[in-house]
A protein has these predicted regions:
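Single conserved hydrophobic/aromatic residue that forms the stacking wall/gate
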Residues: 2-9, 13
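Catalytic PLP-binding core of fold-type I/II PLP enzymes
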Residues: 75-107
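PLP-dependent aminotransferase-class I/II
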Residues: 23-61, 65-68, 75-82
Length: 206
């Protein structure tokens, strides 16, 4: 199977082909400022199934988005709802890359909550390193929908740490006393200072 992603997504042009190396092709679709639309995703699926040869073509099995995107843009709750509807229509999981999730959740321009993401996405991950963790991300299957034998698959791909407790301890700490969000707020505050300085120099923003 394969995944649909914005042509700006890091999994499309970075990662040394890691996705393809695990036998999952990445298909890039057009984006606007890093975001893909439900309309574009629906059109891709419609065109795929309308092709008489689709049984012989690469099957689009999942939709991948980032929030915030690689451009720093944010999906609105409405946009996530629309993407979720299309994904369910075509029985394709919606996966959200949350490497920068903390920044997105505390942004003044954001209207999406963690509960919204859990409700609208089939899987997502909460990034740790961009809020100070030494390593790792927390993968979340919000509907008790983890693939069967998920841990076995993780281990088969060399991704199970011998000292895995190190990951858990970090996230336990990050989600105690709102530390995860406080760190993210500080990052946004610092970024706003930089943004203002760049704005005064005549730069424009998304």
């Amino acid at each position: 199977s394969t995944l649909l992603a914005s042509s700006a997504a890091s999994d499309v042009y970075k990662r040394q082909g890691a996705i393809e190396a695990s036998a999952h092709k990445v298909l890039a679709i057009p984006h606007k400022n890093g975001k893909i639309t439900a309309k574009a995703v629906k059109q891709y699926f419609a065109d795929f199934y309308a092709d008489g040869n689709h049984e012989h073509m690469v099957f689009p099995g999942m939709v991948y988005i980032s929030h915030p995107t690689e451009y720093g843009t944010l999906y609105s709750k409405k946009e996530l709802e629309e993407l979720s509807i299309v994904c369910h229509e075509y029985d394709a999981p919606l996966y959200l890359d949350g490497a920068r999730l903390g920044y997105g959740l505390v942004s003044e321009e954001n209207d999406v909550t963690l509960a919204d993401i859990a409700s609208l996405c089939d899987a997502f991950y909460i990034g740790g390193t961009k809020v100070g963790a030494l390593c790792g991300e927390a993968v979340v299957f919000p509907k008790n929908n983890a693939p069967k034998h998920f841990m076995t698959t993780v281990k088969q791909h060399g991704a199970l740490l011998a000292k895995g407790r190190v990951l858990g301890v970090q996230f336990d700490t990050l989600f105690t006393d709102n530390l995860y969000f406080e760190i993210s707020k500080n990052a946004i505050k610092t970024a706003d200072t930089l943004k203002q300085a760049l704005k005064e120099k005549g730069y424009t923003f998304y």
